[in-house]
Amino acid sequence: RIGWYSKSVATATADALQTASTATDGGWAGNAFVFPRIQGTDVCGRIVAVGAGVSQARIGERVLVDPVLRPADGSFENVGYVGLERDGGFAEFVAVPASNVFWIESALTDVELASFPCAYGTAENLLTRANVVQGEVVLVTGASGGVGSAVVQLARLRGARVIAVTTDERAHERLALGARHTVERSA
C-alpha cells in the first residue's frame, strides 16, 4: 500500500474502528478533513523504516504510537491526530514523527496495547481532572465502549466504587472489569 501517502514507518496492526461519516466532518482544529483520508487513531506495530535523524537501530522495534500530533514549539495550537489530520491505523503502514513512537515490551497483544493511548489516555485525563480518589462513587455512562471500559478499570484502581451504565448483555463484562454495580442503559 505505498501509493499516495509517503514513507512507511510502523506496521499498523490494530485500531478501534473509529471512522468519520462524511467529508464535512471537522478535525480538532475545526477544519474540514482532507480526503482521501485513512482513519484510525489507535496504532501498535513494528517500525519498518525511519526518517532522517532517527537511528536505523529502531527498525524492528515493537512500538505504540501516541496519536496526538503536537507542534514542535509545544503549544496546543493546531494539535492534530493520527487518523484525522494524518493517515492512521487502518493503513498497512503509518508515518508518524519519531517523538510519537514509543518502544514497548509487553505480553499484551497489539490490539490490546493499541487501545491505551486514546481510550485509556482519555479516561486517565478525565479521572485526573475530576480528582477521583478512594471511596468516591463514579457513575460511568457508556461503560460498554473503549473509553468507558477504561474509566471503569482506572477508577477502580483508584479505589472508587464504580457503577457502570451498560446493556444487560455486557453487564457481566463490566463487573469483571471492576464495576461494583451495573445499570441497564435503557432503564
Language model segments and positions:
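Short glycine-/acidic-enriched loop or helix-start segments at secondary-structure transitions
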Residues: 59, 74-75, 150
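NAD(P)H dinucleotide-binding glycine-rich loop of Rossmann-like/cofactor-binding domains
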Residues: 26-34, 66-142
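Hydrophobic packing within well-folded, soluble alpha/beta domains
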Residues: 47, 57, 63, 101-104, ...
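Cytochrome P450 core scaffold surrounding the K-helix E-X-X-R motif
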Residues: 1-3, 74
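Mid-domain Rossmann-like dinucleotide-binding core that forms the NAD(H)/NADP(H) cofactor-binding site
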Residues: 108-186
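Glycine-rich beta-strand-centered segment in the early N-terminal region that forms part
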Residues: 4-69
